[in-house]
C-alpha cells in the first residue's frame, strides 16, 4: 500500500530472503513454488520452529519432558537464519541484519545491506532467573 515511498527504507530483522544459507535458499525457493510469493519473516520463523520441534522429536521422547527440553535447547537443525542457538533464558542468539526495501522485478522486498549485531542474545538475559 505504501508503494514507491517504501523504496530505500532501512529496517532490521534476524532474517531476510537473500540470506546465503542452504536451508534458507531451499526454504525460499520451495515457498515461492508453493505460494507464488516471497516468504515473510514470520513464515521463516514458523519454518524454523517446525524444524526445531522435529529435530528434538528425532532424539527425545516427547513424554520425557526433561529429555525433550534438552533436545530443544540443543537446537540441532539447519535454520533459515544460519547459525542458531538459544541463550540461557531460551531467547535465540542470532545475527540482526540491516535490510533495505528494493524492487526485485515487480515486487518490493528487503535486501541485506549490513549486519547490525552479531550473535546477539537477549539484552536482559542476565536478569532472568532461569
What kind of region is each of these model predictions?
Residues 1-130:
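Extracytosolic ligand-binding ectodomains
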